[in-house]
A protein has these predicted regions:
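SAM-dependent methyltransferases
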Residues: 1-2, 23, 49, 144-147
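C-terminal binding/interaction regions
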Residues: 4, 10-11, 89-147
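Glycine-rich phosphate/diphosphate-binding loop of Rossmann-like nucleotide-binding domains
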Residues: 4-24
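A general structural signal for well-ordered alpha-helical segments in protein cores
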Residues: 15, 42, 46, 72, ...
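A short beta-strand-loop structural module common to alpha/beta enzyme folds
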Residues: 28-39
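Helix-adjacent hinge/juxtasegments
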Residues: 45-85
Length: 147
């Protein structure tokens, strides 16, 4: 599986740890930056990662900033993206099982490294349940993009 990563200056250190962790687990990582502490605009990097997922270049995506809020809002503006802001393992599991999210967001100032990696592991390894009730709900959400 190929996973897109994107972050701003507030989360580049955690993004690098997530990238290394995913590579060690056998995933391919496409890093859309940023890669340093210089101030930058999170929409540039979150949108690049989201576009890679929406286009099929990457199967999933993870975006990060200090709180995760800005990058999750940005990713969700890209057609076809369902991005969940996560700060606990149960939500990581449920958003895959019930919502079939294709992106997740983390706040580097909210979750520590160990919890972040546990959330990532849970999210990437949990399949969508495929239950008709959940698919029906996803279809209704995705139909909103046509309004």
């Amino acid at each position: 599986m190929k996973i897109a990563l994107g972050c701003d200056h507030g989360a580049y250190l955690l993004k690098n740890k997530v990238a290394d962790h995913l590579r060690k687990a056998g995933y391919k990582v496409v890093d859309f930056g940023t890669n340093g502490p210089e101030s930058c605009d999170y929409p540039d990097f979150a949108a690049a990662a989201a576009r890679a997922v929406a286009s099929g270049e990457c199967e999933k995506g993870i975006v990060l900033c200090t709180t995760g809020i800005g990058v999750s809002i940005t990713a969700n503006k890209v057609k076809g993206i369902r991005c969940a802001l996560l700060s606990d393992v149960l939500s990581a599991k449920m958003t895959r099982l019930h919502n079939d999210t294709n992106m997740m967001a983390l706040g580097a100032g909210i979750v520590g490294e160990n919890l972040a990696l546990e959330i990532v592991d849970t999210w990437v390894s949990t399949p969508f349940s495929g239950e008709p009730r959940h698919q029906r709900r996803i279809d209704k959400v995705m139909a909103l993009e046509k309004e």
